[in-house]
Structures are given as structure tokens and as C-alpha cells.
Amino acid sequence: MAVGATAIALLAAGCGSGDSDESSATSNTVVIGIAEPQHLIPSNTTETNGAEVLASLFYPLVDFDAKNNPVPVAAESITPDKTNKVWTVKLKPGFTFHNGEPVIAQNYVDAWNYGAYGPNGQGGSYFFSSIAGFADLQSEDPDGEEGPKTAPEPKAKKLTGLKAVDETTLEITLSAPFASFASLLGYTVFYPLPKAAFSSDGVLAEGFEDAIIGNGPFKMKGKWEHDAQVVVEKVADFKGQVPKVDGITWKIYQDDAAQYADLVAGNLDVQTQIPLESLASASADLGDRFQKSPNSGFQFVGFPTFQKEFSDVRVRQAISMAINRKEITDQVFLGAETPATSFVSPVVAGYRENTCGANCEYNPTEAKKLYDAAKGPAELKITYNADGPHKAWVDATCNQIKAALGVNCTGVGEPKFADLLTKVEKKQPVGLIRLGWIMDYPLMENYLGPLYATGGSSNYYGYSNTTFDELVQAGREAATPEEAIAKWQQAEDILAKEMPVIPLRNDQNVFGYSEKVSNVTVDLFQKVNLYEIEVVN
């Protein structure tokens, strides 16, 4: 997820400032800071801000234990056949949506069909691609988005691999075996939607996104107040795990420094990402309420393939070699992040140190030789989202690139993460793009397929390599986790040669909370544990 990820399998976004009377809420409610979500429809939510809000409104089929194994939550059981191609999901009885509708298997079928149908333009559509019939729900615009021709209607509107056997039984047939498929079902895009979400078959009801109806422990109070807040309140008689607080205000910020000021002043209860400029003072400001914990975040910059100045691999290698990762993590992040020299996070099985090799080693002399030989561009820019804590490290990175390559480099801030993604999706000349990734599910594949596979949900730079795609798919179809990892490691080795992105840093959660709350934890997905946080009496 993009960060963000979200991601989704989520791109990691970072938090940004909002104004709200709710921020001073007392009683048994808490205020948590986020940036403006890009979307709140589950199948279109692939970044961390939206995913956090949806985690309060929905209850997933699975969650994950301490060893990252999937554990049924809304599901009673998830069982594959002998081929790992047909999966049967039994639902726990008694769950309802916030409007009183019972949660049945057909709700999952309808939501997933909507998410998978190409013309609906859902950002998480890729995650349904392993289900039989997905290809027939897609169509290709013959002359691109800018051309006058329109894409033809897909061959089908519904996945052949989805079947509601009865109200509590969902049968999923995959297009190929996938031994770890159950892990995907914990991701945001696999939430169910009620009948009320649709005005007709497959057509989303107008206004539903601003007043989401979920199946989770909290329900929306009012509507999504864009650039201000989303307020949720606890559901009475919820059949799943019950939170300790009665409500949450997701307060939306455009500036993470303003968010931190609210935290220190006691107007905000949790900030999941302390801004860089406040790291040095956070211990004094917050005491033991300044905390760190592992997360799955991977920070990188990508080279858009639609910008021809980056087409020579030597240009990409040179820029990577011009960056002193250790200096930035020590001096800018004060050790809160660590240099990344691989393309996946250390928290997942299959991680290997230094798969990037020499391309990720600081070597300004070799970088200059490569760049000059490739006739790299005289000017570079790194575009980032200003609603996250990125300016300081982007400026530091540009200074290193200037010194090593002798070219001008500037950081360009977009006000919101959503604005950055929109510009990239429209193929505007953004230069190098600041991106981050929080795993959607704990598999090595989640750092490969969505980010680099052809048509991947967060492959914003447009990278495509047939051999890479085949290896990722071969890993999915492998009979054992060990065989899968071997294939995925081969795929990662291709990235190390072609450098479609530059690995920069591995994250950890660096968060803080107010005196009003306790039992605050932030997990590998960069989400606050909404079931354990509580108000201090």
C-alpha cells in the first residue's frame, strides 16, 4: 500500500493540517491524525490514510498473528482444495452492516466484482487479478487516455471465479494455484459492501463514498468532511472484537508540523509519523509517549518510463550511486530509519541483504562517469507530497546528487499525496517521484507484483518486464512457501539489474501520543491498534 499503504499494499503517504472543533473531544473518544485520503471505497483505497479510516469501518476476513500468518476474523474458516486453486470461505454468522443489512457471501461477490471491473477504474483492481475471469473484465483503450477513441466494453462484468454458495459460504476459483492466497484476504480491497452501496447492479450509489456503510466496529457519524475530518462511533452489540473507545475523530492535516504542534498541545491523541524536524525534541516534548516500533515501510524514488531522459539504465544507476543513504539516515532521520539496499522489507520471509549491490553503494566517482557517459539530463527534480515529512530528506538527497553529478537538482512539493499520484497517473513530467510502500499482506510477492508487474496497482512509473512478470506468477503458483520465495528472489534480482526505482530507506514507526490515552501501538502496516487504545481515566 502506498505511503503508502497502504497497499494498500498501500503506498505510504505521510500525515499532513486541519481545523476541527472535534479535535478537543473528551469523554471516551480519541483523535488520530491523518492526511486527506485519496479514496474511501475499499477497492479504490491503496494508500495508508484511507486504509486507516477503513480499518475502523470494516472487519476483514483475516488478520495476522505475530508470525505474519493469516488468522480468520470475519471468516470462520478459509480452506483450499488440493490444488490451491479453489478456496472456500465460511463466514461467521451474526455480522451486520451499519445500516442493519446482514453480511452475506453475496456482499463479497458484489464488492469484488465492482472492484475488478476495468471501466470502474478502481486502484486496487490488480489485487483481484488472480481470480478466474479477471482478464475478461478488462479492456484496453486503443489510443490511450488522451486519444479520441474510447475503450470497448469488456467481455464480461462479473468474475467467473466468484460464487456465493449460500449466505455464509463463498467459493473462490483462481486462474492458477496460489498457496498463499489466504494472506491477500486481509487487505482493504477485499472488504464487503452492502446492497445499499449500489444504485443498480454493479453501479455505485451516488454519495456512498462520503457516507461509507461498513461491517466493522465503528460506523460513520455524519459524512466525510474533506480536508477536515472523518468521525466514527462505536457500533452497539458488535459481534467481533470490541474496541475500548467509543469513537474516533480522524483529523485531517495538510501539514505534519501543525499536526505535531496539536499533539504536544494535547489537541491530538495520536500521530503515527513524527515529523523529521521534531525528532530531536520529541523525547523532551513527549517523554515516554514518544515511541518506536517496527513497520514494513520501504521508501524509494521511481523513474517514470514516460520520461525518456531516464530510459538509459546508466542514468538510473548513477543517480542511485550519487546518494549517501547512511549520511541521510544518520543526519536527517537521526537513526529513525535505516538504509535500504534491497527491494523488499526485512520484515517479510525471503528478504536478503544488499540485493541491490553496487548500484546502492555510495560511489560519487563512478556515478559521475556513468552519468556523463549516458549523457544524463542537466537538471533533475524529485517530486514529493508536502503533506508528509519529506522536504528535509529530499533537499538533502538533491544536494548529494548536485555534488556528485554536477547537475542541478530541486525538490518539488505537491500539496497532497493524492495530488502527486494524480499527476503521475496522468503522466505529467514530475521527474523522480517520491514513493513509499507499506505491505498489504505479509508476503515478499506484495513488494514485487503491485509495484513492478505490468499493470501493477501501484506501478505508477510504468515498468514492464515479461520475465519479471513470469517469475512473480511462478512464485504464486509454487507448491510451497520455500519454492515461492526462490522464484520471487529471482524476480528481485531483475530489479537490481534494471533499477526502475532507487531503494532509499526501510522505515520504522516513530509515533507519539497524548497524556489522555494509553495502550497505544502502531503495527507493521502503520496502523494504530484501534481495539487496544483506551482513554486514561
Regions found by a protein language model. Name each.
Residues E76-A132, E171, D262, E309:
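Aromatic- and charge-enriched surface segment that lines or borders ligand/interaction sites
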Residues P152, T329, V407-L420, K426, ...:
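Extracytoplasmic/peripheral linker and loop segments enriched in polar/acidic and small residues
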Residues I104-N113, E167-T173, P177, P217, ...:
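Alpha-helical secondary-structure segments
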Residues E146-K149, K157, E167-T168, L174-P243, ...:
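Gly/Pro-rich hinge or "lid" segments in bacterial periplasmic/extracellular proteins
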Residues E206, V235-S281:
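Ligand-site clamp/hinge motif
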Residues G33-K82, N113, I213:
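N-terminal lobe/hinge region of extracytoplasmic solute-binding protein
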Residues T338-A373, A386-A392:
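Structural transition elements
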Residues D227, D372-M439, P481:
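Ligand/substrate-recognition segments at binding pockets and active sites
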